[in-house]
A protein has these predicted regions:
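Active-site bordering "gate/hinge" segments
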Residues: 1-284, 288-291, 300-303, 391, ...
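Dual-mode signal for accessory low-complexity, basic/Gly-rich regions
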Residues: 259-441
Length: 441
């Protein structure tokens, strides 16, 4: 059954509007272990999510094929389900006819390179890591993957959109060992061109990270000036990104629900959601509802400018939809496209040089389990380095970093200029925080 036929059949069953979201994804993953091929996995997934609207109520069904009998059964189930729904807020479908921005094509050349070439690349990566030091005893997670996605959205209101993209990912971990202690350093690269993979950078970063962790000790409990590595700052921003969602506001799960126009963050904090951000891997012209995407400030100079909205939450709050509707199991929620904290002017090393006695946090574990997205509180096991006289002094591990996201964002003293190139979803540069609580020995 074609997408148009699905829509026609849904309307015949009494639905006022019907939308079809067809998604195709392919991934090939090659893993190497001790110079030998460990696994080669190929995944191909296809799904069709069908939404039906009647009397302001929206129902959802999903099929894994377009086989006539399967789709007809799903449509009958959808029509019955919508009738039985008891929705509290009306839902909507977006009409066609909007103008959409042009975005750069993101298509990888991985099909031009044979599998054997990719395996040899991984072998060379593993060999180069082992050659870095006698203390590097093994290479783990030596992996290469290819990813392809295609989406088509069509509805009975004239919407007909499609997008596709593909990219490759390579990463590896160097395991270093000394005096009975084993640590790991990871690095990777996301790219579209196989020949542009930054293998030398992966080798240098993974080996240096692993070797620098050897001999890690403890630190005294106290409050310290803290520098968050960009990876850690990104994890933190990502973990609390739901506070900017209109869905969270609708469920009263964010303190920002009624804070538009109010100063909640520090003067130097600017947080944007920009579907066209040049440092992001994927740029989008429309969301999963077909609404045009646009660049917007969520926080500007510390002032909350607005939240991310779907058609449903925008209607509830009397706002315009922001082009941030994303599908999760058929339903639509408001999520960021490319969310980032705007860069400053200093490099990571320049920021570290401003700290006389503090901590550089390079790794956090169990972040989602140790935070409260409503209050903003977090407690996470961490690792990093002592900073002494503006330089990294010694590695430390197994301490707990505690604080509050909103308080932290009011105590950012320096912002780095090092947002990661080709990031996906959320990004943040290196941040220097005035003080955070550390529980050590």
């Amino acid at each position: 059954m074609t997408l148009k036929e699905i829509i026609k059949k849904g309307l015949e069953l009494g639905l006022e509007a019907v939308e079809v979201y067809a998604s195709t994804s392919e991934s090939n993953t090659i893993k190497l272990d001790e110079g030998k091929l460990d696994s080669y996995n190929i995944k191909e997934l296809f799904s069709v999510s069908i939404r039906g609207l009647k009397d302001g109520k929206m129902g959802y069904v999903t099929c894994e094929s377009l086989e006539d009998g399967l789709v007809e059964e799903a449509l009958h189930s959808l029509a019955t389900t919508v009738e039985a729904l008891d929705a509290t807020e009306p839902e909507f479908m977006y009409e066609g006819g909007s103008t959409y921005a042009e975005v750069p094509e993101l298509i990888s050349d991985y099909k031009e390179h044979p599998t054997n070439e990719k395996i040899e690349m991984l072998k060379g990566l593993e060999k180069a890591l082992l050659a870095k030091s006698d203390k590097i005893v093994k290479v783990g997670y030596c992996q290469y993957s290819e990813n392809y996605n295609k989406v088509q959205i069509m509805n009975s209101k004239g919407l007909d959109l499609s997008r596709e993209y593909s990219y490759i990912v390579t990463y590896a971990g160097a395991l270093a060992s000394e005096n009975g202690q084993t640590v790991i350093g990871m690095s990777g690269d996301v790219n579209t061109k196989f020949g542009n993979l930054e293998l030398d950078r992966i080798v240098n970063e993974a080996s240096e990270e692993a070797l620098s962790k050897l001999g890690a000790g403890s630190i005294e409990t106290g409050h310290y000036p803290v520098v968050l590595k960009r990876d850690v700052a990104t994890q933190l921003l990502s973990a609390f990104s739901s506070v900017f969602s209109g869905d969270s506001a609708l469920r009263k799960m964010t303190i920002l629900a009624d804070k538009e126009g109010q100063k909640v963050f520090g003067d130097n904090i600017n947080i944007l959601d920009d579907p066209f951000y040049e440092k992001a891997l994927i740029q989008s012209s429309f969301d999963d509802e077909g609404v045009p995407c646009n660049k917007k400030y969520l926080v500007e100079n510390g002032v909350v400018k607005g939240l991310l909205h779907t058609l449903k939450t925008a209607n509830f709050f009397g706002k315009a939809p922001t082009g941030n509707g994303q599908r999760a199991a058929g339903s639509i929620t408001a999520r960021p496209t490319n969310l980032y904290l705007q860069e400053g002017s200093l490099s990571k090393d320049e920021i570290i040089a401003t700290v006389e006695n503090g901590i550089f946090i390079t790794e956090v574990n169990g972040l989602h389990a140790g935070l409260n997205p409503i209050s903003g509180d977090f407690n996470v096991q961490s690792s990093g380095f002592v900073i002494k006289d503006g330089k990294l002094d010694r590695p430390i591990t197994l301490f707990v970093l505690s604080g509050n996201f909103f308080e932290l964002m009011n105590n950012v003293e320096e912002i780095g200029n090092d947002i990661e190139e080709r990031f996906t979803g959320v990004a943040c540069p290196t941040l220097k925080i005035k003080s955070l609580a550390v529980s050590g020995k």
